[in-house]
Regions:
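Extended amphipathic alpha-helical interaction segments
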Residues: 108-223
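Sec-dependent signal peptide recognition
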Residues: 2-8
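A cross-kingdom marker for long, charged
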Residues: 23, 32-33, 190, 197-278
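N-terminal Sec/ER secretory leader and immediately downstream segment
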Residues: 21-120, 124, 128, 262-265
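C-terminal motif of bacterial Sec signal peptides marking the signal peptidase cleavage site
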Residues: 15-16
Length: 278
């Protein structure tokens, strides 16, 4: 549940504005495809899944999109006025808050179906979760420390250039310095993901998702290894320092591009929220 919802939020944040409406119009198809990578359902259960996805999307259109529109406009205003560390903390908190709200709404729809899974269906889910973990290990846990830090820097540069256009040499150097300083947390993140997966699968096996999964997905950070909490905190602080340096080095054109993009997002989200569901 956590991963596919965050994937949707990330896609909305990183997609080109012209693609927001197309992405949202196909979000139900994406969610169904993602869930069917874990759920082995057919017949009436498959029809029920489709109905529950439709209800979730109705909730999201009415409740989440207006907030996204408001916050995108607020972010544009903050950036236009000059980025501060407080602005970055605000943005992070807003993103996490939206994710938790959406996950709780998704659980309200999915839990009744999850509570009726058979032992065979649960074993299928366990196998798929194990495959996801192996994929994560291939993408994030292989290679030397130097290789992984360089790969992290390349990913960040690509994402920043989606927003800013081509980065200057000084901006790229700021990214490299961040990646050299900030702790590598992927092993800790992998262990934490496995902890959360184990807790959620235990609820599914016990047929208690309706009673308890909603609280679990909005408080997934409870029970984290203190070492992971400390590493995440240090990582976020270093990342924010890097973003402030990127902002300090930004050209007028780069800043205007991001502000305009955020305002286009806001307009797109408002239009989608106002449009009748198909």
């Amino acid at each position: 549940v956590k991963r596919w919802l965050l994937a949707i939020l990330a896609a909305a944040a990183l997609a080109g504005c012209s693609g927001v409406r197309m992405a949202y119009d196909n979000a139900d198809t994406f969610i169904r495809w993602r869930l069917l990578q874990f759920l082995d359902v057919n017949g009436e259960q498959a029809d029920e899944l489709d109905e529950r996805i439709t209800r979730f999307m109705g909730w999201h259109r009415a409740n989440a999109l207006p907030k996204y529109a408001r916050d995108a406009e607020d972010a544009a205003h903050r950036l236009e006025s000059g980025l501060s560390r407080e602005d970055l903390v605000w943005g992070y908190d807003i993103f996490i808050g939206h994710g938790r709200e959406a996950m709780r709404a998704a659980v309200d729809q999915l839990a009744p179906l999850l509570d009726r899974l058979t032992p065979e269906q649960i074993r299928h889910m366990e196998q798929r979760v194990a495959e996801e973990n192996r994929k994560f290990a291939r993408e994030y846990l292989r290679g030397s420390e130097r290789d992984r830090r360089e790969q992290r820097a390349r990913r960040i540069v690509e994402r920043l250039e989606d927003w800013l256009g081509n980065l200057s040499k000084a901006q790229i150097e700021a990214v490299k310095q961040f990646s050299a300083r900030a702790p590598l947390i992927d092993e800790l993140r992998d262990r934490d993901n496995r902890r959360i997966q184990g807790e959620i699968l235990a609820l599914i096996r016990a047929h208690e998702t309706w009673k308890r999964l909603g609280e679990k997905v909005v408080s997934w950070d409870k029970g984290r290894d203190p070492a992971y909490v400390a590493a995440r905190t240090a990582n976020v602080e270093e990342f924010n320092t890097m973003l402030l340096e990127i902002d300090r080095l930004a050209t007028r054109e780069q800043r205007a591009r991001v502000v305009a993009e955020l305002r286009r997002y806001s307009a797109e989200f408002r239009a989608l929220a106002a449009r009748p569901a198909s």
